[in-house]
Amino acid sequence: LMRFHKFLFLLLLLSSFIQAQNAPSVEKNQFKINVLLPGFVYEYGINNKNTLYSELSAGFGYSSSGFGENWSFYPYIQEQFRHYYNLEKRTAKGKVTSRNSGNFLAMAAYYNFKSITTNDSYSSSNSSVVIAPVWGFQRTYKHKFNLDLNVGAGYGFSKNDSEFVPVLNFTLGWVIGK
């Protein structure tokens, strides 16, 4: 009887260890190329549910007025500490969690460089910083096609101004590598 109890205990211990090994987890390293707003992303898995997300991208703008036409180029860097909170739930429902497909909460920081314009009659926007808590989701589909959306409310400040600002980041692209 004592051997049976030891065997049962060992079996339960081993099965819980095996389950822990199969728990859904974020990728250790993930690279992406964005095409909607051209850019590059690297996401580093800190542990099973948390990542450090780094993005270098650019936005574009066009305006026309009595001063003439103007194209603007807005490079920016974004950093996020992401917590993926629904990986187990997605796995239980048979949904994909690979390549960090899940919902997340994050603390985001953006650095927007001074814009570059094609018409000297238009002034460039100053560099600025935005800090914001955001909610979002990321999905990677067939052929590694990736969609990432996050929204929040933040505080932005520049050399001349500071204010509360809405935050919206939407990217389409591909996961590259494995």
Describe the function of each predicted region.
Residues 20-76, 107, 113-119, 175-177:
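Short glycine/proline- and aromatic-enriched beta-strand/turn motifs that initiate or cap beta-hairpins
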Residues 27-36, 71-77, 103, 125-131, ...:
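Residues that define the transmembrane beta-barrel architecture of outer-membrane proteins
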Residues 40, 79, 133-135, 151, ...:
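Membrane-embedded beta-strands of outer-membrane beta-barrel proteins
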